[in-house]
């Protein structure tokens, strides 16, 4: 338990040190697609690790996509097309306990058969745009594209 808390604190401090506190962005990114009051921006020509994708989304005032239900999963799959994209899910801090990077409850799941594998180091979540199914993988095993979500501020 102490180890998980220490990892969480270390992660938070590292993120703040590397990127600082970001100012709210008022306008959605160009070419963003709206869904349920949020804006989704795909970077399908940019391969990155999960951490690189997370920080790139942070830098534009967004986050890696968090999927709350089947309708949103299908929406994201259609944007992803034939690409494999990073989602904001991880079990890095406690193996087998999946959480969304933004703190949302990890209720909806759409795992591919045999997933999550639970293999050592497979702590990051990807979505296959062909099927909409999820898989766990390592941060460096697969360089995937990213899809950033920006919450609409009212």
Predicted features by range, described:
Residues 2-8, 19-154:
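Extracellular, disulfide-bonded carbohydrate-recognition/adhesion ectodomains
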């Amino acid at each position: 338990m102490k180890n998980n808390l220490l990892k969480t604190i270390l992660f938070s401090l590292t993120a703040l040190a590397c990127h600082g506190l970001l100012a709210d962005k008022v306008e959605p990114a160009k070419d963003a697609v709206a869904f349920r009051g949020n804006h989704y921006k795909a970077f399908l020509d940019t391969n990155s690790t999960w951490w690189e994708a997370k920080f790139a989304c942070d830098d534009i005032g967004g986050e890696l996509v968090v999927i709350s239900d089947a309708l949103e999963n299908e929406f994201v799959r259609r944007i992803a097309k034939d690409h494999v994209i990073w989602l904001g899910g991880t079990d890095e801090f406690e193996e087998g306990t999946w959480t969304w990077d933004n703190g949302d409850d990890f209720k909806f799941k759409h795992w591919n058969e045999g997933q999550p594998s639970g293999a050592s180091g497979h702590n990051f979540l990807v979505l296959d745009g062909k099927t909409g199914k999820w898989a766990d993988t390592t941060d460096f095993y697969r360089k995937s594209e990213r899809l950033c979500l920006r919450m609409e501020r009212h």
